[in-house]
């Protein structure tokens, strides 16, 4: 009997949703950064075994939106919990239950599918803190399963996947077995560049960064030639991104190229230009151009 179903991962920003998904898949498909709100789109990734297929929906973290992009991210996360077979609520033991957690859990109470509590980053906590966190969350919601994990190290992740398989109904193979994501290759490329920009810039530039792939061509010898616009909101941000004598932009380009070559499995030439688009996160037309469709 073949089993298949949809699993969505929800939680506050920066609790490790993308890290968990990337570990399960063994591929870097969802942007990972130490900054919150780095996942901006619902990304479906597909894990296929001999007798099962799990379609994961990786979502933006749910938070109080401050601009139209934020509204898109929150609505995207809420929509992802509809018509799924299992919800994984991901959180960390070293953080108290906040308004954001209660907001998410309240929105899940009407769901007919089972909800798991997945307590991530237990390797960074203490047994006492983990136990207290389990007690707190159990008093807020009737979880079907509680699974402590360390996603970055893979601890207990196999156990979590095995439990997920038990929730799958009998069903078809929704995607070909060699397909691991439903997003276009260009999208993954743009996410890689955005992640490297966030990592290189650290706290120097806030989240007002977007990536627009201007050109992506593959030559006869297999080399990809990629041209990218890195979009920011202020002229002062542009100067920071470029850096002294262009050193910061060079660093972003070099780290992006390395990761792109790993993903595309071939040589890559990447050129990055920095463009200022003031208040782009509140510009509905520009958001559409960048792939953030209004919900």
Curated annotation (Swiss-Prot):
Question: Where does the protein end up?
Answer: Cytoplasm; Cell membrane
Q: Where is this region: G3?
A: 58-61
One cellular component (GO) term of this entry: cytosol
Q: Which CDD domains match?
A: Era, KH-II_Era
What's the short name of a Pfam family annotated to this entry?
KH_2
Please report the stretch or stretches of sequence annotated as the Era-type G domain: 3-170
Q: Which InterPro entries match?
A: G_ERA_dom (IPR030388), GTP-bd (IPR006073), GTPase_Era-like (IPR005662), KH_dom-like_a/b (IPR015946), KH_dom_type_2 (IPR004044), KH_sf_prok-type (IPR009019), P-loop_NTPase (IPR027417), Small_GTP-bd (IPR005225)
Q: Where are the annotated segments for G4?
A: 120-123
Membrane topology recorded in Swiss-Prot or TrEMBL: Peripheral membrane protein
Which cysteines in this chain are paired by disulphide bridges? none
Q: Which residues hold GTP?
A: 11-18, 58-62, 120-123
Question: Is Kinase tagged as a keyword?
Answer: no
Q: What are the coiled-coil residue ranges?
A: none
Per UniProt, the keywords (alphabetical) are: Cell membrane, Cytoplasm, GTP-binding, Membrane, Nucleotide-binding, Ribosome biogenesis, RNA-binding, rRNA-binding
GO molecular function annotation: GTP binding; GTPase activity; ribosomal small subunit binding; small ribosomal subunit rRNA binding
Enumerate the residue ranges of region (G5): 149-151
GO process terms (BP): ribosomal small subunit assembly
Q: What are the KH type-2 domain coordinates in residue numbering?
A: 201-278
Q: Where is this region: G2?
A: 37-41
Q: Where is this region: G1?
A: 11-18
Indicate the quaternary assembly.
Answer: Monomer.
Q: Give the HAMAP family listed for this entry.
A: GTPase_Era (MF_00367)
Instruction: Report the protein's function.
Output: An essential GTPase that binds both GDP and GTP, with rapid nucleotide exchange. Plays a role in 16S rRNA processing and 30S ribosomal subunit biogenesis and possibly also in cell cycle regulation and energy metabolism.
Protein family according to the UniProt entry:
Belongs to the TRAFAC class TrmE-Era-EngA-EngB-Septin-like GTPase superfamily. Era GTPase family.
What protein is this chain from?
GTPase Era
Q: Which organism is it from?
A: Clostridium botulinum (strain Alaska E43 / Type E3)
């Amino acid at each position: 009997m073949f089993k298949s179903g949809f699993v969505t991962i929800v939680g506050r920003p920066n609790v490790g949703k993308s890290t968990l998904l990337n570990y399960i898949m063994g591929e870097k498909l969802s942007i990972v950064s130490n900054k919150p709100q780095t996942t901006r789109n619902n990304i479906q990734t597909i894990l296929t075994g001999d007798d099962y297929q799990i379609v994961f929906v990786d979502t933006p973290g749910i938070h109080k939106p401050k601009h139209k992009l934020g509204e898109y991210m929150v609505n995207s996360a809420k929509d992802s919990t509809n018509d799924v077979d299992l919800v994984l609520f991901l959180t960390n033991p070293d953080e108290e239950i906040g308004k954001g957690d209660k907001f998410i859990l309240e929105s899940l109470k009407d769901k007919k599918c089972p909800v798991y509590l997945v307590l991530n980053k237990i390797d960074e906590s203490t047994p006492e803190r983990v136990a207290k966190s389990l007690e707190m969350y159990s008093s807020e919601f009737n979880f079907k399963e509680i699974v402590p994990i360390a996603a970055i190290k893979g601890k207990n992740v196999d156990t979590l996947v095995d439990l997920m398989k038990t929730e799958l109904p009998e069903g078809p193979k929704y995607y070909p077995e060699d397909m691991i994501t439903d997003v276009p290759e260009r999208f993954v490329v743009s996410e890689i560049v955005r992640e490297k920009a966030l990592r290189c810039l650290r706290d120097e530039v806030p989240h007002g960064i977007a990536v627009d792939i201007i050109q992506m061509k593959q030559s006869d010898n297999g080399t990809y030639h990629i041209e990218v616009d890195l979009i920011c909101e202020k002229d002062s941000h542009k100067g920071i991104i470029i850096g002294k004598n262009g050193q910061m932009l060079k660093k972003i380009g070099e780290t992006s190229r390395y990761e792109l070559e790993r993903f595309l499995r071939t040589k890559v030439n990447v050129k990055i230009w920095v463009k200022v688009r003031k208040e782009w996160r509140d510009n509905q037309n520009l958001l559409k151009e960048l792939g953030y469709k209004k919900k």
